[in-house]
């Protein structure tokens, strides 16, 4: 009897999902909502047609001209083709799945134009589609005067052939283009109504050659295929296996409408541009009786959020309590008036139960999500990522895997105690201490900042709603007020330039401040780069679907940070004191933040702090034994319910 759980290898062998993934990876096609506006020569809309589900394709006609084909939904929808020689792109909101293409009618100046307003695009698919369009435009040969006249007088070309994938030589030719980037607009402007065709060759933004390393491993690609099929799934893996990276890739591959990104903590939610699971659910802490939780969820704003949700992403699932998950499942069915598990919502769940457990009061034993009564009905597929990306040293990887499973041999103890002598800082950058308690973090950072000579430079955040600053404090990795001095130890809390090593968790020291403007800090990072750090923006979603934003420097003081807030980070140089470890998995989370054993210093190591919950060990052991958790511990009724909710293709 199958439990409905499978391994990444099985997922890789599924032909239907492989074919689906192939279709999804075509950068010349895009499926989204499209509003077609026919504009007058003055730029005013004369006619508008809204298509809820349309397909855009890049191709060429029989004259090898670049064309855009718009296919309306349904068998009766007639395709329309637009020449792209004079297209103008408006891409300011591409990161949210929206963009606009303005095309002069038939490429003839003065004949008005057609405007395609794209929305609800999977952001990553939209980015690749626009990138392909820019590249093909950049290397397309421009017609001379005679050939242009011949084309206008000749018959209208009818054939349409999808363009070929971008070739390396096309990237090189595009990168060699020296023209200014005048044809790519950041946002539509009412005054910009000229239909004059741009000069050839079209200018493009600076483009880099793609890396030969695939973006996703085979394991990660298997997870993505399952998600794109509409399958509810839980994917797990040890620290550093790329769970956060994959989750962001998944979110970029799904339509924004109907996709709700959540996490168990505010910081984790902010990393994926979402909200906390509690804020979305709208039932408070979930400790109230089920009837009261349902009443809270039926409030107009909360109820609409549940009704609109088609795909629910939950990150850091290890910190979600079983009873809360069961109540969410019951609320979803009741509010949506559907008997399907979780009210028919596709669940995309990520996390590692061998990391931080749910927070409980007193000595109460935490109940993990996989112990929830509804877990098996709601999560028919579990995939485990096994390839570690954060650490390259196989010895360190093996050590961490042993600690993850609660095993601390004499050799592991010897290696960790030996790190106490490591000199993990250099060039004025000292190791970040990971603390078990947030109070210790605040006291440590405040003490060391006061000890530095010189003036304090304060940087105050700009919040979209100052009255909700406390909400932003809880969900943003940056504080309302950041105080710095010359010599302050800092850490980046956002990726700025991955190729240059300026990534989330990169360590540095303040070496100066600009003399003009706001006096922005100059930071020398451990990777050797000195950079002026400028304001960045964080956006979080709160109860009722409202969005809040905070503008602040992407820095935090880094003499110390808490183990809880370090979850998901990769740190260059780390100092750890595990004397006050109070939860299973806490020591593993702390140790696994380090990129290498050489960048780790462990003080007063005691093997007894390495522990994990036996129930979690059993969960993962049974997962690896066959195709997933055994049904032997479930009663027949629950087992039958599980099988009813299995995908028949598995």
Curated annotation (Swiss-Prot):
UniProt catalytic activity: Couples ATP hydrolysis with the unwinding of duplex DNA at the replication fork by translocating in the 5'-3' direction. This creates two antiparallel DNA single strands (ssDNA). The leading ssDNA polymer is the template for DNA polymerase III holoenzyme which synthesizes a continuous strand; ATP + H2O = ADP + phosphate + H(+)
Enzyme class name: isomerase
Phenotype upon loss of function: Mice do not exhibit any change in telomere length in thymocytes or plenocytes nor significant change in chromosome gain or rearrangements.
Region (PINT): 14-192
Primary localisation category: nucleus
Localization of this protein: Nucleus
SUPFAM superfamilies found in the cross-reference section: P-loop containing nucleoside triphosphate hydrolases
Keywords per UniProt: ATP-binding, DNA damage, DNA recombination, DNA repair, DNA-binding, Helicase, Hydrolase, Isomerase, Mitochondrion, Nucleotide-binding, Nucleus, Phosphoprotein
One of the GO BP terms on file: DNA recombination
DNA-binding span(s): 586-605
Region named Disordered: 171-199, 631-650
Phosphoserine found at: 40, 164
Cofactors (names): Mg(2+)
EC number from the UniProt entry: 5.6.2.3
Residue numbers binding ATP: 237-244
Amino acid composition bias (Acidic residues), ranges on this chain: 633-650
InterPro entries: DNA_helicase_pif1-like_DEAD, P-loop_NTPase, Pif1-like_2B_dom, PIF1_helicase, PIF1_RRM3_pfh1
Domain notes: The PIF1 N-terminal (PINT) domain enhances the interaction with ssDNA through intrinsic binding activity, it also harbors DNA strand-annealing activity.
HAMAP family (alphabetical): PIF1
Functional description taken from the UniProt entry: DNA-dependent ATPase and 5'-3' DNA helicase required for the maintenance of both mitochondrial and nuclear genome stability. Efficiently unwinds G-quadruplex (G4) DNA structures and forked RNA-DNA hybrids. Resolves G4 structures, preventing replication pausing and double-strand breaks (DSBs) at G4 motifs. Involved in the maintenance of telomeric DNA. Inhibits telomere elongation, de novo telomere formation and telomere addition to DSBs via catalytic inhibition of telomerase. Reduces the processivity of telomerase by displacing active telomerase from DNA ends.
Subunit structure and binding partners: Monomer. Interacts with telomerase.
Protein name: ATP-dependent DNA helicase PIF1
């Amino acid at each position: 009897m199958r439990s409905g759980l499978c391994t990444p290898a099985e997922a890789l062998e599924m032909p239907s999902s492989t074919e689906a993934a192939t279709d999804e990876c075509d950068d010349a096609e895009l499926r989204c909502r499209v509003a077609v506006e026919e504009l007058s020569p003055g730029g005013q809309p004369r006619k508008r047609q809204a298509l809820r589900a349309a397909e855009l394709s890049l191709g060429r006609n029989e004259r090898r001209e670049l064309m855009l084909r718009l296919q309306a939904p349904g068998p009766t929808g007639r395709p329309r083709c637009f020449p792209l020689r004079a297209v103008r792109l408006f891409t300011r909101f591409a990161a949210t799945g929206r963009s606009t293409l303005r095309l002069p009618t038939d490429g003839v100046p003065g004949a008005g134009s057609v405007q395609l307003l794209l929305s609800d695009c999977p952001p990553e698919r939209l980015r690749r589609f626009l990138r392909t369009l820019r590249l093909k435009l950049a290397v397309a040969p421009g017609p001379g005067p005679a050939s242009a006249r011949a084309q206008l007088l000749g018959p209208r070309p009818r054939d349409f052939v999808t363009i070929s994938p971008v070739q390396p030589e096309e990237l090189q030719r595009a990168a060699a283009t020296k023209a200014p980037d005048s044809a790519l607009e950041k946002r539509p402007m009412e005054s910009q109504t000229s239909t004059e065709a741009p000069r050839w060759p079209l200018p493009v933004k600076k483009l880099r050659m793609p890396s030969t390393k695939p973006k996703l491993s085979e394991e990660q690609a298997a997870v993505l295929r399952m998600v794109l099929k509409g399958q509810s799934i839980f994917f797990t893996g040890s620290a550093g296996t790329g769970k956060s990276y994959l989750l962001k890739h998944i979110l970029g591959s799904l339509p924004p409408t109907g996709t709700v990104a959540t996490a168990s903590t505010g910081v984790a939610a902010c990393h994926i541009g979402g909200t906390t699971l509690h804020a979305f659910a709208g039932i408070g802490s979930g400790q109230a009786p089920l009837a009261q939780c349902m009443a809270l969820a039926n409030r107009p704003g909360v109820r609409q959020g549940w009704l609109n949700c088609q795909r629910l992403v939950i990150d850091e699932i290890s910190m979600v309590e079983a009873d809360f998950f069961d109540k969410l499942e019951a609320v979803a069915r009741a509010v949506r008036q559907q008997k399907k598990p979780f009210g028919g919502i596709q669940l995309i769940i990520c996390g590692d139960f061998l990391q931080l457990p749910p927070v409980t009061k007193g000595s109460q034993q935490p109940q993990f999500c996989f112990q929830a009564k509804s877990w098996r009905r709601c999560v028919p597929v579990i995939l485990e990522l096994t390839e570690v990306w954060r650490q390259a040293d196989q010895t360190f990887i093996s050590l961490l895997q042993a600690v993850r499973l609660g095993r601390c041999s004499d050799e592991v103890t010897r290696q960790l105690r030996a790190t106490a002598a490591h000199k993990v800082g250099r060039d004025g950058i000292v190791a970040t201490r990971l603390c078990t308690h947030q109070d210790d973090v605040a006291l440590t950072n405040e003490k060391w900042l006061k000890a530095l000579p010189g003036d304090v430079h304060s940087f105050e955040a700009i919040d979209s709603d100052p009255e909700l600053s406390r909400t932003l404090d809880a969900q943003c990795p940056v504080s309302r007020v950041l105080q710095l001095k010359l010599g302050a130890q800092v850490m980046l809390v956002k990726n700025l330039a991955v190729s240059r090593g300026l990534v989330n968790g990169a360590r540095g020291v303040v070496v100066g401040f600009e003399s003009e403007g706001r006096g922005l800090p100059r930071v020398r990072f451990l990777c050797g780069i000195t950079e002026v750090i400028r304001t960045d923006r964080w956006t979080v979603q709160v109860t009722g679907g409202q969005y809040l934003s905070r503008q602040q420097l992407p820095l935090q003081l880094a003499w110390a940070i808490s183990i809880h807030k370090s979850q998901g980070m990769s740190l260059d140089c780390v100092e750890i004191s595990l004397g006050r470890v109070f939860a299973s998995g806490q020591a593993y989370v702390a140790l696994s933040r380090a990129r290498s054993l050489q960048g780790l210093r462990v003080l007063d190591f005691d093997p007894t702090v390495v522990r994990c919950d036996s129930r979690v060990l059993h969960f993962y052991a049974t997962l690896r034994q066959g195709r997933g958790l055994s049904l032997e511990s479930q009663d027949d009724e629950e087992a039958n319910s599980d099988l009813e909710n299995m995908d028949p293709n598995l």
